[in-house]
Regions:
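ER/Golgi luminal nucleotide-sugar-dependent glycosyltransferases, focusing on the catalytic module
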Residues: 1-185
Length: 185
């Protein structure tokens, strides 16, 4: 039996996450759930009866920060070390499958070993990665004036880099923009 690993990153929408876990609860699936360290820990173990559920509450995740990538690597590495899966699906805790588990497994069996990674045609991230953006971890702080000061500092920093024609990365390959959610072998 080919098993799938669902790697879920969650931080809120607990009712939707609960529904997601119920919909993924299938003996052909293992579920790796990371709940953001800033969020209250909720034990969803009682909601899953057929799949193996592994819950982690370890990393403080910030939007636009390296911590997002750290959680992704953590989930991929943990799942890879625990089992041999035909597919690894990285999804958010706010996603819900549109098909049944039988239909999902049949689709991926028919398309194995195709990698499903999205990107946007004609859009690159060159303008975003060529500059250094300061204080990404503090993108949203609670102090209104602090937010304005940080925003001005970031804007000024990018302005100076443009003025000096500074290029942080000199890449020959073109990097594309796309979603972080994937289904890979």
């Amino acid at each position: 039996m080919k098993k799938h690993a669902y790697l879920i990153m969650a931080h809120n929408n607990w009712k939707i996450l609960e529904k997601l876990l119920i919909l993924l609860d299938d003996k052909r699936n293992d579920i790796y759930l990371h709940i953001d360290l800033k969020s209250d820990f909720i034990d969803f173990s009682s909601k899953v009866h057929n799949a193996n559920l592994f819950i982690f509450h370890e990393i403080d995740v910030r939007w636009g920060d390296i911590s997002l990538i750290q959680v992704e690597f953590f989930l991929f590495k943990t799942a890879y070390c625990k089992g041999n899966y035909s597919y690894y699906h990285l999804i958010s805790g706010s996603d819900l499958p549109l098909k049944t588990q039988d239909e999902i497994h049949a689709f991926f069996d028919a398309h194995y070993p195709t990698e499903f990674i999205g990107f946007s045609l004609g859009m690159t991230c060159d303008n975003r990665i060529n500059k250094v953006y300061i204080f990404p971890k503090y993108q949203r702080i609670k102090n209104r004036y602090g937010n304005k000061v940080l925003c001005l500092l970031r804007s000024f920093c990018v302005f100076l880099q443009n003025l000096l024609n500074y290029n942080h990365y000199k890449l020959k390959d073109k990097l594309m923009i796309g979603p972080e959610w994937v289904s890979i072998t």
